[in-house]
Amino acid sequence: MRAKGLLKEYEVVGRKLPSEKEPQTPLYKMRIFAPDNIVAKSRFWYFLRQLKKFKKTTGEIVSIKQVYETSPVKIKNFGIWLRYDSRSGTHNMYREYRDLTVGGAVTQCYRDMGARHRARAHSIQIIKVDSIPAAKTRRVHVKQFHDSKIKFPLVQRVHHKGNRKLFSFRKPRTYFQ
């Protein structure tokens, strides 16, 4: 899989084709994060082939639909459980991100894993994604934004026209001192 652009969340439901031996086959539902529905179907068959003993030729996709965020204007903390293959083996990992949507948090995770661990998108498997309350977050880079009186330094000051003179002796210093 190539994780290009913002990843979207898809709910894919599939099953093994019914036969005379097994007329009622169970349905399998997965949450897949992919750039489009074609890649989502492909990832669904990839995971199902690993978990159950059938593949695309002996199965069918019953439904595929994109899952939209219920409140995309409220920032949330997301916990992501994943496993990835590195050069030294397979590792389990838990990561936390702050984002507006689940897709945005998972996209951040893929970018972060590529930057920090050189993990390619095809070697990352998302196990579980969950929204976490502020009290249950563990990572410092997420906890630092839970302060209600948080202040950000003004790195570059802006000189307003009303306060400055028409001519100046020197170039204005806008950097933070």
UniProtKB/Swiss-Prot annotation:
Any one of the GO CC terms: cytosolic ribosome
Matches recorded under Gene3D superfamilies: 3.10.20.10
One GO MF term attached to the UniProt entry: structural constituent of ribosome
Pfam families referenced in this protein's UniProt entry, alphabetically: Ribosomal_L18A
Membership in a protein family: Belongs to the eukaryotic ribosomal protein eL20 family.
Name used for this protein in its record: Large ribosomal subunit protein eL20
UniProt keyword terms in alphabetical order: Ribonucleoprotein, Ribosomal protein
Signal peptide: none
Native source organism of the sequence: Drosophila melanogaster (Fruit fly)
GO BP term (any one): cytoplasmic translation
Transmembrane segments: none
